[in-house]
Amino acid sequence: MKYFLSISFLLLIATDLYSDDHSEEQSFPGMVSSDVFDMGGGMEMHVERRKTCNQGTVPKHFHPAAGTLVYVLDGVSQSKSSGKWKKYSNNEYWFEKSDWVHGGETDAPDLGDVCSDLLVIRVAESG
């Protein structure tokens, strides 16, 4: 676990350094940076950093990936990935299984006036 967190931290720093001098059109609300790393063997790692306030839920979507890890760097977020809503805060994370359709839920709890800073990591086939 320490190894995974160390790699995640290094990727976060590398993403911040790389994205500081690149201006890209944001494709997702709150997207700060988005990078893709070639892992070899036909696989790639997608690393995104998102910052939002008072977002509520996101539009319905899914990720065609082997799975997605969402790590809360700061603030509060929530997920229903376990089957029921759960709040996550600083240094907590959740896993979203492959092709899990989520977002747009009408039963999402109101988190109130909160912000979140998230690191999203997913591994997918190249292309």
Residue ranges and their predicted role:
Residues 40-42, 52-53, 81-101:
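Short acidic-glycine-tyrosine-enriched beta hairpin
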Residues 78, 99-127:
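Ligand-binding loop in jelly-roll beta-barrel domains
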Residues 55-68:
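A short beta-loop-beta micro-motif enriched in histidine and acidic residues
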Residues 65-83, 92:
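Glycine- and acidic-residue-biased ligand/ion/polar-headgroup-sensing regions
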Residues 3-6, 15-46, 87, 94-95, ...:
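A short, N-terminal "cap"/entry segment at the start of jelly-roll beta-barrel domains
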Residues 59-62, 83, 105-107:
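Surface-exposed patches in mature extracellular/periplasmic domains of secreted proteins
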Residues 42, 47, 67, 116-118:
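Extracytoplasmic
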